[in-house]
């Protein structure tokens, strides 16, 4: 008898937005046209901050990828990342393949108990790691900005995600 084939799991970023912050997004750009990045009010780290990053498991190969991708953000932002074993690190990364890919947004990490992850990298294909680090430094999805200029075909979106 043939073994049943499992349908592939959808790989999406799961928002970790605290309830009090829903719908308080603010664009980081004031230029006309589409906004490329947004930061929820009060979620970005202080300019020049060094954010400590701790791994909660994972392999040496996974750690290497994370460090490379964090380095990209360090080059393009006014933030630095220090990889430590300290339990009170601001960013704590787990690698649970059953929990998807997600990150709390920016300074929300401060309110998460020190023994819990603030980011999970259940898969690391494509730009997933860099994407989640964008959230960790305080950026949200640009489509969440009401002024972002995206015209949704709501019926098509619902149909796509309902199947």
Question: PLM features: residue spans?
Answer:
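Zinc-dependent metalloendopeptidases
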Residues: 1-163
